[in-house]
A protein has these predicted regions:
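N-terminal glycine-rich anion-binding loop in soluble enzyme alpha/beta folds
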Residues: 1
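Short, well-ordered amphipathic alpha-helical segments that serve as non-catalytic structural scaffolds
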Residues: 4-16, 114
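Adenine-nucleotide phosphate-binding core of ATP-dependent small-molecule kinases
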Residues: 192-229
């Protein structure tokens, strides 16, 4: 994945006649330790954490690729608003089971970027506004932004919120517990159901929302029923 994605980026730059002569390189962040929103310089500790991350996701490659390109350009490399931005208020961390605490993993980069863009469009600063921001993609984030901080948001990676093209979202806990102890599945398989093979993929065998939406608009089932849900 690393070489493929890096070479893809370099090929696109070459095709667009953009020389490797940058003042800085910035990338999407990865699944690092929880951190407030902001821009962070890429260093050896960050790269080590990404290479040894507990959770796998393509976003873990962003900083590594940016750092390599930046070295060729002799310029600094950064990430901005990684998926692990954690600005939750204390009450948002609590669940009905004391041993389980909610964590903040969401599409922070896009959510904060569109918030700033919207704020600018109405002549305001992001830090002045209270917003509900929704990201729709392979996963779905629904976040409460209070004066520039995301004080509550669903865990868009590991089983909260609406189901999405590849993720199961919030599901009945009792039925999940029964599934886990049914003897039919390993822990790895259950986790894949929650993230990777859940949602539209589980129901329809594909994550191509364009195709699914077209079939649904034509009234074809089960595409219409699942997409409406």
């Amino acid at each position: 994945q690393y070489e493929y994605r890096k070479n893809f980026i370099l090929r696109l730059l070459a095709e667009a006649d953009i020389p490797l002569d940058f003042d800085a390189v910035i990338a999407r962040g990865g699944l690092l330790k929880p951190t407030p929103g902001g821009v962070y310089a890429i260093n050896e500790q960050m790269k080590h954490d990404l290479l040894n991350a507990r959770m796998e996701h393509a976003c873990n490659l962003g900083a590594l690729i940016a750092d390599e390109i930046a070295r060729e350009c002799h310029c600094p490399a950064y990430i901005a608003d990684p998926e692990v931005v954690d600005e939750l208020q204390p009450a948002a961390r609590l669940t009905g089971i004391p041993e389980i605490e909610r964590i903040s993993i969401f599409h922070a980069l896009n959510s904060k970027a569109v918030s700033r863009k919207y704020a600018a469009s109405i002549g305001k600063h992001y830090e002045e506004l209270n917003l509900i921001v929704v990201h729709l993609g392979g996963g779905i984030s629904v976040g409460a932004h209070c004066k520039g901080r995301v004080i509550d948001v669903n865990n868009a990676l590991n089983g909260e919120g609406p189901f999405s093209p590849e993720r199961a979202g919030t599901i009945p806990a009792d039925q999940l517990a029964e599934l886990c102890f049914s003897g039919k599945y390993t822990l790895k398989q259950i986790k894949k159901m929650l993230n990777g093979k859940g949602g539209l993929t589980a129901h329809l065998g594909m994550n191509d929302v364009v195709t699914i939406a077209r079939k649904a608009s034509e009234g074809e089932e089960p595409y219409k029923g699942v997409l409406d849900a």
